[in-house]
Amino acid sequence: MGRGPPAVLAPWMLFLSLAQANFAPHFFDNGAGSTNGNMALFSLPEDTPVGSHVYTLNGTDPEGDPVSYHISFNPSARSVFSVDPNLGNITLIEELDREREDEIEAIISISDGLNLVAEKVTILVTDANDEAPRFIQEPYVVQVPEDTPSGSSIARVRAVDRDTGSAGSVTYFLKNPHPTEFSVDRHSGVLRLRAGAILDFEKARAHFVTVVAKDGGGKLRGADVVLSATTVVTVNVEDVQDMGPVFVGTPYYGYVYEDTLPGSEVLMVVAMDGDRGKPNRVLYSLVNGSDGAFEINETSGAISVMQSPSQLRREVYELHVQVTEVSSAGTPAAQAMVPVTIRIVDLNNHPPTFYGESGPQNRFELSMYEHPPQGEILRGLKITVNDSDQGANAKFNLRLVGPGGIFRVVPQTVLNEAQVTIIVENSAAIDFEKSKVLTFKLLAIEVNTPEKFSSTADVVIQLLDTNDNVPKFTSHYYVARIPENAPGGSNVLAVTAVDPDSGPWGEVKYSIYGSGADLFLIHPSSGIIYTQPWASLDAEATARYNFYVKAEDMEGRYSLAEVFITLLDVNDHYPQFGKSVQEKTMVLGTPVKIEATDQDAEEPNNLVDYSITHAEPANVFDINAHTGEIWLKNSIRSLDALHNITPSGDRTWSLEVQAKDRGSPSFSTTALLKIDIVDTEMLSRSPMAAFLMQTKDNPMKAVGVLAGIMAIIVAITVLISTATFWRNKKSNKVQPVRRVLRKRPSPAPRSVRIEWLKFRRTKAADKFVLREAPPNENCNNNSRGSTPAPQAPAPPPPPSPAPSVGQAPWTVPTVSGSLAPQQPQQPSPKPRAVAKRKAVGSPVQSALVSELRQKFEKKNLHSKAYF
């Protein structure tokens, strides 16, 4: 009994003891972020490439036996990983997709050959930006009435991105922008008609707008990528609607930002009739949920906020929009309802706002006179602009949009608030006659904000007229032609002047003036020029009149035009023969000429034709109808042939000639002409007879010849008399009348005087030179044209030392001889005696004595000699 177990049990007991000593292997738990261990809290990006070594299973056996690794999945799941049983390296064998499978469940096991330890692990698949935005509710087809107001919301596109974070946020823009038609809200995807855009069903029944949805970007395979998607919004322009309304693009979401102004559009709901053939129009209305904060445009479905965002009490508004069809008869039809969610978004941004005296205002009007002074301020405009933001967000620029260069705005840059001043830049462009209304837009646009919010206000200036224009004639000159026989008071022409000013300033009064205006009058209002009632016009006296017409407004501003009036000649004068036509003398073989004049001013009224109306006999003379020359017929070549024509053998013939003008009606005058016919032989025998015969036709010719002969005789007489007068005057100048030369008191003999003159000839000659031309003296006292030189009282004659008998008291000794005393006037000698006396003396000696005498007299006058 005290012995051990039986021997047969010993091997089994040994085996059991050995089995109990072999412990199971286990994994190492290295925690999150480790790439080896038991895959606890292991995550893997979904963009990991297939075949990548992503993890290493790591474990151990307490006995140090080698271990092997295994991984398995649910039968319904994919086998995503494979493992190296010896090394434990896990390799990705299938692509991951977080959006399809964001976690993977697997069973990993470790075995030492005897023991197998298995664990269930969950591998998290992390996001990568591998999903592009995807539009939902495609296709986008919008039915828009062609009368939809510009700026209205017409559709909303919506795209979702299954990525997370910024890679899942979506913004919208137009790929092919339509700057004149559509725009899209970058946050909400609301598609709107641009301001000023108009849809026209007849021009385009459909518009295709490409909208791009772009995510916020993220990592994909180690690189930053931004993915996008596009969709096409088909905007069908509707003409009519008639089926039950159906909302398009539900659900509806809208956003009201802090800077949204009351009356701004938030979003637009769209409903259309299912009957596209001839649809009825629909009307929108808000059923409940707005609390007076929102209104909907009953025709476009545009929902607008009516209160300032600061006055809104809730963050989210759930509105119910009802659409009602209206039949062609105007009665309500089918209805539909849709919920609309509007969220209030808090942003610190306000657009600039214009204020008038009574509050916010977007239209300002002013009346002012045209052409104000340059630099004048438009004080009638009270405009204030304000931006409620702070700092850089409240800085904006001001400018005027409209016809350039007329006005400028001050200031041009504003921070928060400013008083707007508009100043005149171009006074000439502010013209009532060019434009009665000037319209500008005052634009305020932010400077440093990405949104560039702006606002506009209309500035309308009504111009008032002033008298700034001068009446202007339609032409600088006017030309008129009237017949000279026009009666008094006849209309001549009408002048027209236009004054573009309005009212009384535009009324024009006419007047005429000038040297040629005496015979004319002008109507002060109509500008009609007519002749004076008493005027008698005569083209022969004055054929042309020229004067000025004046157009003047009520304040005296005027302009001038020149008027030229030409009188048209009328045949109102008879041809008139001269007096010499009554009798003519014809030399055989030479024609005689008659001449008549017509006082009319113009041709053909003053052109005269000549004819012989009566002659006895009628076959003797011919006449040139144009020149009036009369000659004997070619058959009559001698006086004998002429005498044989009549029994009496007359040499004097009587003709009745006629002068007739070419006017219409024509006037004529007749005259009786006597022609004396002589032969050339008779004239050659007696020149005086020839002359008298020639002057018989023209007595004034003889008078002219006699007057010419008398004129020649008179001219010769005057020429001889003038020559004689100047010769006597020159000779008498050297013999002054009643002048006595007083001798010097020096007792020097005359011989000394002569020697002094002889040896100092050069110096004495200088003294004889006359420094200043003396006036002509009246030596003969026979001319009243010259004034005699002043004379001193005549002193007694100086005593003469022993005058010799017969010596003349007026003798003056000279170098070459003595001067003869002046002889008293005696009766004029006969020409022969004068010639004999002139021949006595030498001409050379007489000339020399005369010259020395003249020089001596000038010398004595220069030395102030006593007389």
UniProtKB/Swiss-Prot annotation:
Sorted keywords for this record are: Calcium, Cell adhesion, Cell membrane, Glycoprotein, Membrane, Receptor, Repeat, Sensory transduction, Signal, Transmembrane, Transmembrane helix, Vision
Posttranslational modification: Undergoes proteolytic cleavage; produces a soluble 95 kDa N-terminal fragment and a 25 kDa cell-associated C-terminal fragment.
The answer to whether UniProt assigns keyword Calcium to this entry is yes
This chain is glycosylated at: 58, 89, 288, 297
Where do the record's region annotations for Disordered lie?
767-843
Cytoplasmic face of the membrane: 723-867
A GO CC annotation given for this chain:
adherens junction
Q: Where is the composition biased (Pro residues)?
A: 790-802
State where the protein is found. Cell membrane
Q: Tissue expression, per UniProt? A: Expressed in photoreceptor cells of the outer nuclear layer of the retina.
All copies of the Cadherin domain together span 36-135, 136-247, 248-354, 360-473, 474-577, 574-689
Query: Where does the record place Polar residues bias?
Result: 777-786
Parts of the chain on the Extracellular side: 22-701
Principal location class: membrane
What GO molecular-function term can you cite, just one? calcium ion binding
The portions of this protein that span the membrane are 702-722
Signal peptide boundaries: 1-21
CDD domains (UniProt xref): Cadherin_repeat
Q: What is the membrane topology here?
A: Single-pass membrane protein
Q: Name one GO biological process term.
A: calcium-dependent cell-cell adhesion via plasma membrane cell adhesion molecules
PANTHER family xrefs = CADHERIN DOMAIN-CONTAINING PROTEIN, CADHERIN-23
Whom does it interact with, and what assembly results? Interacts with PROM1.
Q: What's the stated role of this polypeptide?
A: Potential calcium-dependent cell-adhesion protein. May be required for the structural integrity of the outer segment (OS) of photoreceptor cells.
Could you identify this protein by its name? Cadherin-related family member 1
Q: What is the scientific name of the source organism?
A: Bos taurus
Q: What is the lineage of its organism?
A: Eukaryota, Metazoa, Chordata, Craniata, Vertebrata
The gene name reads CDHR1
